[in-house]
Swiss-Prot record:
It comes from Francisella tularensis subsp. tularensis (strain SCHU S4 / Schu 4). The gene is nuoK. GO terms for molecular function: NADH:ubiquinone reductase (non-electrogenic) activity; quinone binding. Belongs to the complex I subunit 4L family. NDH-1 shuttles electrons from NADH, via FMN and iron-sulfur (Fe-S) centers, to quinones in the respiratory chain. The immediate electron acceptor for the enzyme in this species is believed to be ubiquinone. Couples the redox reaction to proton translocation (for every two electrons transferred, four hydrogen ions are translocated across the cytoplasmic membrane), and thus conserves the redox energy in a proton gradient. It comes from the Bacteria. This is NADH-quinone oxidoreductase subunit K. InterPro entries: NADH_UbQ_OxRdtase_chain4L/K, NUOK/Mnh_C1-like. It is found in: Cell inner membrane. One of its GO terms (biological process) is ATP synthesis coupled electron transport. The chain crosses the membrane at residues 13-33, 38-58, 70-90. GO terms for cellular component: NADH dehydrogenase complex; plasma membrane. It catalyses: a quinone + NADH + 5 H(+)(in) = a quinol + NAD(+) + 4 H(+)(out).
Length: 110
């Protein structure tokens, strides 16, 4: 079992993958359980991207490749843009409809 060395902390690849899988499962559960609140859906998607980033970093460190870190930076940039756009849309919806409950926003009105 190979260990990742980070500033005198040794974490095995298995522990890192278990942590990443746990993050991914929590985010999927957040999406499945709470389909009504837009903010919780956005946070669950961000948590899912964090799990993917963790996987990229674990495997990049395991194979001593720098490309995993490069992919993480690109994913973080896309996630930041997605969060900014998503929150702007949520604010616009809240100002117009006075709610962010998805069950009340299912009508397409002009």
């Amino acid at each position: 079992m190979r260990a990742l060395k980070m500033n005198s902390i040794s974490v095995s690849v298995t522990h890192g993958l278990i942590f990443s899988t746990l993050l991914f499962v929590i985010s999927v559960a957040g999406i499945i359980i709470n389909r009504r609140n837009i903010l919780i859906l956005l946070m669950s998607i961000e948590l899912m991207l964090l799990a993917v980033n963790t996987n990229f970093l674990i495997f990049a460190n395991m194979h001593q490749q720098a490309m995993g870190g490069v992919f993480v930076f690109f994913i973080m940039a896309v996630a930041a843009a997605e969060t900014a756009i998503g929150l702007a849309i949520v604010v616009a919806i809240f100002r117009k409809r006075k709610t962010i409950d998805l069950s009340k926003l299912n009508t397409l009105r002009g």
